[in-house]
Regions:
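ATP-binding/phosphotransfer module of carbohydrate and carboxylate kinases, centering on a glycine-rich
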Residues: 1-141, 147-171, 230-231, 274, ...
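Phosphate-binding/catalytic loop of phosphoryl-transfer enzymes
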Residues: 117, 171-178, 182-283, 287-288, ...
């Protein structure tokens, strides 16, 4: 479905500024590799789309100056993007002098939509139709299977995805999924005990069923992309997602860190302390997840409301014990928490900061911040970043 010219906003200065990005100056992930000649065209395509996405509407001449590409290259690429329906001409800039005002171009932000899926909730799978700027336009959810049944989990996910594709009002650019577990870059879920998946080709299977591009990542890795792209995070940080389980995503040098086994950030089953503790679902005693998961903290608080400060302080201390070596080894500047503010904000964060500073080098890591994310729907927005990166080279 296309958008007619009379439905598009006029290309005023206010419109251009507003559309630079819905959440402010989003940033892109940096590449650590040199561009080979045979890859130059793909690099140039991504550079142009990246510039338009983050900077907003501009003329072809502006785009040439901003990217350093020749005007001929820009003209060829823009013509290709317009033919593909990715870029649109949105009017002319207000005249400020003699001569013909330049035509402004931008990503077709209203001409495509993204489907985002979050499988990390304790009782439901969440899904949304999102704009290219990460705004949630429509949302739906389906109950999460009560037991780890891989077939039932996939059936529920597929039904939710199909519903969202049907209610999308523009062509779907792709589907992004944030799922618990260890996920390879090709979208194969190596292990997700909570969903009953082992070596499950989630990305390939759903793509075949929907006939759409699908990208699947660990839910914390999706969340960290959203925090970096749309949030206020630095170039080196960790995001800890606290919900049914506990997991982390890491950005170092403006690049996601996945690890050799694609399990970087799997901190939930690190044993914290030698004083025993609650038994974890994995069978071990004293895993971080057994101390820090939302259900565990809430159960402890319900059992002894008078001990609220002590319970939350202990949880924050255990978390800091687990992450202090990571903060020091990677020289991270901040730790961002995603989860219920009523549990994480205040006492828990204060205890984490105190313990983190006590367990790292004095005078070096004293400015490391621990804070809550200010974003809602962080996994869904991370799913949008995944699709933008995979389909357009935009991140």
């Amino acid at each position: 479905m296309s958008v007619s010219d009379d439905q598009r906003p006029a290309a005023t200065t206010d419109f251009v500024t507003a559309n630079a990005h819905a959440f402010g100056p989003a940033r892109h992930l940096r590449s650590r590799t040199k561009v080979l000649p045979e890859h130059a065209r793909g690099h140039n395509r991504a550079l142009v789309l990246q510039t338009l996405y983050h900077s907003g509407a501009m003329s072809r001449a502006d785009l040439s100056r901003e990217t350093g590409l020749t005007r001929v290259t820009i003209s060829d690429l823009v013509a290709e993007f317009i033919a593909d329906g990715i870029v649109v001409e949105i009017g002319v800039r207000e005249a400020v002098g003699p001569g013909k005002p330049p035509i402004l171009i931008d990503i077709d932000r209203v001409g495509h939509q993204i489907i985002g899926l979050d499988l990390s909730g304790p009782t439901a799978f969440e899904g949304a139709v999102l704009s290219l700027d990460g705004d949630v336009l429509e949302r739906r959810q389906v109950p999460r299977p009560a037991t780890p049944d891989g077939d039932a989990a996939y059936d529920a996910l597929r039904g939710l995805a199909q519903t969202l594709v049907e209610i999308a009002t523009q062509p779907v650019l792709g589907v992004g999924i944030g799922t618990p577990g260890v996920v390879r870059p090709d979208g194969l879920v190596l292990s997700s005990p909570n969903l009953g998946w082992t070596d499950f080709p989630l990305e390939a299977k759903l793509s075949a069923d929907l006939d759409l591009p699908v990208l699947a990542r660990n839910d914390a890795n999706a969340a960290v992309l959203a925090e970096y792209t749309f949030g206020e995070a630095e170039a080196d940080f960790m995001l800890i997602k606290i919900g049914r389980g506990v997991g982390a995503g890491l950005i170092t040098g403006s690049q996601p860190l996945l690890g050799s086994r694609f399990a970087a950030g799997e901190i939930g089953h690190v044993v914290v302390g030698t004083d025993g503790g609650p038994r974890c679902a994995c069978g071990k005693i004293g895993c971080l997840e057994a101390w820090l998961s939302v259900s565990r903290m809430q159960e402890a608080l319900d059992a002894d409301p008078a001990a609220r400060e002590e319970i939350l302080r202990d949880s924050g201390t255990r978390m800091a014990i687990a992450i202090a070596p990571i903060v020091a080894a990677l020289d991270l500047s901040e730790v961002v928490l995603s989860g219920p503010a009523e549990l994480l904000d205040g006492t828990l964060i204060d205890a984490a900061v105190e313990t983190l500073h006590a367990r790292t080098l004095e005078g070096v890591f004293e400015d490391v911040m621990v804070r809550l994310t200010r974003q809602d729907d962080i996994v869904l927005r991370g799913a949008a970043v995944m699709v933008l990166s995979g389909q357009l080279g935009v991140s």
